Swiss-Prot record:
Comp. bias (Basic residues): 9-21
RNA-binding in keyword set: yes
Molecular function in Gene Ontology: rRNA binding; structural constituent of ribosome
Function: This protein binds specifically to 23S rRNA; its binding is stimulated by other ribosomal proteins, e.g. L4, L17, and L20. It is important during the early stages of 50S assembly. It makes multiple contacts with different domains of the 23S rRNA in the assembled 50S subunit and ribosome. The globular domain of the protein is located near the polypeptide exit tunnel on the outside of the subunit, while an extended beta-hairpin is found that lines the wall of the exit tunnel in the center of the 70S ribosome.
Assembly: Part of the 50S ribosomal subunit.
Region (Disordered): 1-21
Gene3D superfamilies (UniProt xref): Ribosomal protein L22/L17
Disulphide bridges, residue numbers: none
Gene Ontology biological process terms in this record: translation
Name assigned to this protein: Large ribosomal subunit protein uL22
GO annotation, cellular component aspect: cytosolic large ribosomal subunit
Keywords: Ribonucleoprotein, Ribosomal protein, RNA-binding, rRNA-binding
Length: 139
């Protein structure tokens, strides 16, 4: 087997293992919103049950709650359909926001100068998992 074939097989195996490690996840990339503003919303739902997180997102008066709700809905659907998890036992195991590429625009100013306006983007990642059974009172 030649070296390129070996590398391809390793990449493919690595990708499959990577998928196995993260059941019930969803990512929204290049969301045209500042990561700082999206983190305010994501911090509220982290660790909550999925049903409670959906209710919270419905009433949070921030623009970032809409894309976060979409990602949460997608992660929930992935967990139920692809990973065969139970809907009523799902919790938000991890939720984080990374900065995407920044679009730079010029704003003309006085005397021929210009300021740079940074239009920031975000990558929103939400991972849901099943809640551990809490019926271990006897042990």
């Amino acid at each position: 087997m030649t070296a390129p074939e070996q590398t391809y097989r390793n990449k493919k195996q690595r990708k499959q293992q990577h998928k196995l490690r993260r059941p019930g996840y969803a990512i929204a990339k290049y969301v045209r919103m500042s990561p700082r503003k999206v983190r305010l919303v994501v911090d509220v739902i982290r660790g909550k049950s999925v049903a409670e997180a959906e209710d919270l997102l419905r009433f949070i008066p921030r623009a970032a709650s809409e894309p976060v709700a979409k990602v949460l809905k997608s992660a929930k659907s992935n967990a139920i359909n692809n990973d065969e998890m139970l809907e009523d036992r799902l919790v938000v195991a991890a939720a984080y926001v990374d900065a995407g590429p920044t679009l730079k625009r010029l704003l003309p100013r006085a005397r021929g100068s210009a300021n740079i306006i940074k239009k920031r983007t975000s990558h929103i990642t939400i991972i849901v998992a099943e809640r551990e059974s809490l019926s271990r009172k006897g042990s």
